[in-house]
Amino acid sequence: MLFSKSLLLSVLASLSFAAPVEKREKTLTLDFDVKRISSKAKNVTVASSPGFRRNLRAASDAGVTISLENEYSFYLTTIEIGTPGQKLQVDVDTGSSDLWVPGQGTSSLYGTYDHTKSTSYKKDRSGFSISYGDGSSARGDWAQETVSIGGASITGLEFGDATSQDVGQGLLGIGLKGNEASAQSSNSFTYDNLPLKLKDQGLIDKAAYSLYLNSEDATSGSILFGGSDSSKYSGSLATLDLVNIDDEGDSTSGAVAFFVELEGIEAGSSSITKTTYPALLDSGTTLIYAPSSIASSIGREYGTYSYSYGGYVTSCDATGPDFKFSFNGKTITVPFSNLLFQNSEGDSECLVGVLSSGSNYYILGDAFLRSAYVYYDIDNSQVGIAQAKY
């Protein structure tokens, strides 16, 4: 039997409309600018304050005090806060969990916020306080506001309205609830921070996000809330369960930070360690921090100890093997050049960027994370990890 052309087209059209439509996940892309600053970081205590932005539960007197001028990176994204929106830039950090902004009466090169000019501001309570590993801090009030980020608007987002701060810019912490500054205060409480609010308000389907720092010389990177982007990594994502410890190495009833198990490190074909330790994946830390014996082993192999640095140094032109970090069968390769940090511009001597954590865990900062694509799955208390692709 012959079909007319019009009848055939009608049948095909009906079939196409009847075909199932694949549901696309709701995601939100947040771009950030990479800022590199060479500035004197005075009195940095190596063992007790790894990194430049690590949230501290309590200060420690242990460690070597050094004066280090170090080019470090931080990741600025633009937000609007309040009604009408006040635009400012904040530093994105996976190692802490709170949004806070420089408030009325403070100053910052990257913008400040004045709650008296907002009709959506709601003060919750006083007592906002957060401190970091470099000795900097911010204090003020807890409040709720409307915040626009990446083209999306979130209402009633809890944040710190800082009335005093010496950090330089506000911070957008996107870590776990248990690491919120409010959970560590005398009047302890927790709240739904940005990733959870994005899901609660239907802006993304999953409380999860992917971090892509881009290459060492790149000027921008991105976070994809709610999903992952397979074009930015090689192979598949290895799934890692989070380890239930806090940043002092103490066991907890649930995950409070993005600790995973690092099973070993190789340099070229040589094994550095096959002992498994927890490792914190922290974009707010610049270097890599390792258990003391491992950090010393790497330092001695590739540098000479310098008391003025408080660490091992080598020529900035030095070459070495790729470092391979093993996680549940997945290997992340980090070029040796990513581990060298110049003291100041023009110096011929570089710090080998693997220092002692003073604890039985690693902190894997930007020196590692630039080589990795990391999917932070808050809903399932897991992390996915793969080799980043540039």
Swiss-Prot record:
Q: Which family does it belong to?
A: Belongs to the peptidase A1 family.
Q: Which Pfam families match?
A: Asp
| Annotated transmembrane regions | none
Tell me which Gene Ontology terms the entry assigns under biological process: proteolysis
Q: Which residues form the active site?
A: D93, D282
Task: Read off the CDD domains from this record.
Answer: SAP_like
Q: What is this protein called?
A: Acid protease
Asked whether the UniProt record includes Transferase among its keywords, one would answer no
Q: Which residues form the signal peptide?
A: 1-18
InterPro entries, sorted: Aspartic_peptidase_A1 (IPR001461), Aspartic_peptidase_AS (IPR001969), PEPTIDASE_A1 (IPR033121), Peptidase_aspartic_dom_sf (IPR021109), SAP-like (IPR033876)
A GO molecular-function annotation: aspartic-type endopeptidase activity
Query: What organism is recorded for this protein?
Result: Saccharomycopsis fibuligera
Q: What is the lineage of its organism?
A: Eukaryota, Fungi, Dikarya, Ascomycota, Saccharomycotina
Keywords, alphabetical: Aspartyl protease, Hydrolase, Protease, Signal
EC number(s) for this protein? 3.4.23.-
Ranges for domain Peptidase A1 come to: 75-386
Any single Gene Ontology cellular-component annotation: cell periphery
Recorded name of the encoding gene: PEP1
According to the UniProt entry, the coiled-coil residues are none
